[in-house]
Amino acid sequence: MWDLDSFKATGKANFKASYWPFVGVSLLLGILTGAFYVDTPEITYHVENLNIDSVEQFYYTVEPFLNLLAPAALLSGLGGIALHLLVTNPFEVGTNRFFLESTTFHKADVGRIGMGFSVNYGNVVLTQFLKNLFIFLWSLLFLVPGIVRAFGYFAVPYILAENPNLDHDRALTLSREMTMGYKGDLFILEFSFLGWYLLNCLTLGILGIFYVNPYLYGTRAEAYRFLRAKAFENGITNPMELPGMGTL
């Protein structure tokens, strides 16, 4: 039975048992994924007396600089995409391996965060790329289908953390099967941290670094462990596909 309170309690206990490793790994993951939100003061411009001619004159003044910056902006954007695909996504898989081993063995091995780079890196990159691509394409339809699909692929980085050799098609399909009937529960899990997110904003991200994000990642790991157990119970998967944390 899905028990969010139990997931959060266990996730918090595991996080506190390995406090500094959890904080360090969560911080690195947050930096790469942009998980930390810093509230900035709103700047208001008063434009009652704005002159259109002045705006046009300003545009023509800065246009040469904009033309110079455009290629740099394009390269920066492409570099950001490459960083996400080649570094952030595999790192997410490695950190999930760390969180799963921590909750399974009740000890933390920070060295596991590199697993996404050291074991079948190409398959990890491809599978995570396809996951992101499908979520993006579904989001083009409307926001809600994109959110639903994102929760459908919730388990993908955990599946890869457990078995990075699993074929990309099977990893994506298995995640959809594992989360069937639980997408609403996963949404509630994320929504239950809303109050913490608001408090994190008030502390300019400090609370997120030292408490909220490690707590959240620990809770998500427990949710995956539940989905994994149900998948075995329902015959959706087997030990060949998901061999557990005693391998690699």
Range-by-range predicted roles:
Residues 1-248:
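Hydrophobic alpha-helical membrane segments
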